[in-house]
Amino acid sequence: MTNLFKITGTVTLKKGAGRQLKSGGMWVYDNEIDTFSETVEDGGLIELHDFDDYFMGIGFVNRRSKITVRMLSRHEGEINEEFIKQRVKDAVSYRMDTVDTSSCRLIFGEADFLPGIVIDKFSDVLVVESLALGIDRFKQLIVDDLKEILKEYGMPIRGVYERSDAKVRQLEGMERVKGFIGEEFDTKVMITENGVKYYVDVKDGQKTGLFLDQKYNRRAIGGLCKGAKVLDCFTHTGSFALNAGISGASSVLGVDASELAVNQATENAKLNGLEDIVRFKCADVFDLLPQLEKSGEKFDVVILDPPAFTKSRNSIKNAVKGYREINLRGMKLVKDGGYLATCSCSHFMDPELFTKTIGEAARNVHKRLRQIEYRTQSPDHPILWSADESLYLKFYIFQVVDEK
């Protein structure tokens, strides 16, 4: 496609379709569409009309995807380089107002009205994840705009790495891509977050290298960890464990099934001078927790930060079983009056269902939960109301007490 900004045709909705869209949603699904004009090009821009031919907006189209249209604008008018640059400016300006920008998510797809692209900043390195065909064609333009805008804020970028290697790209008819955008650089980046130093592996780490969405949740557990014996399950590269360590925990055990992650976590502990307090074990959490219970272990604080147990509605029942089991096991290991931090990062595990599942786990082990905090993802992962896909992280902190 020679002209990125060309409107390639019109997509028309079925009669009565598009209710979610009309209430603020950002996606149009394949089963909501009536017709495509002959000129429509997959990956291109289109006008979206309702069944009565009323203009509803401009978006990217991809007939190979169940999410067939991703909305870019609700207004008539030209989409051009300045339009895209303003979206990027708005995204950066929002982060400057709301979060520590030394390391943060700068662009969060639909929630920043740039559907299908995620860009994280780790110190002076950008990591790009493109998940949709339409926005993929704007990727270089967005990166160039971002570098220019950050430089104006006094934050020059030394390198950009692409981690568009998620399986979801195949649903868009795209290959999984990974590599440098521009000049090569050392992909092991050191950052500081909440006073904790980390090495972030942007090339081979999970997702883009570090889960920035938990930034302030990691800090929130600190006050409970002073002098405490702490268990951090699904520790990844040790972020919750290290926050517990610098907050004065007496001992911390971090557990993860990935040997690569555990090795990185151990290195991060040494980087912070915490290797005598924070130690890590490579093990399956579902296997280890019953073993710890059998041996009579108890902890002042237990942290559960599992991966998404479901990425579709079809597997939600199995996910509920997984979350119930892990919370049940975790509660059994908390001392009477101790604390549990537990979360779900699956969009399909909605807040109501997650809350219900935790409650069932507590009843099964005869524990009472005293809620201290309920939190979501950090503000650099904004939750756009009516765009349900932007809310995915649920995070509780409880005091766990025996039934009285």
Feature map (PLM): residue ranges:
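Rossmann-like S-adenosyl-L-methionine
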Residues: 179-404
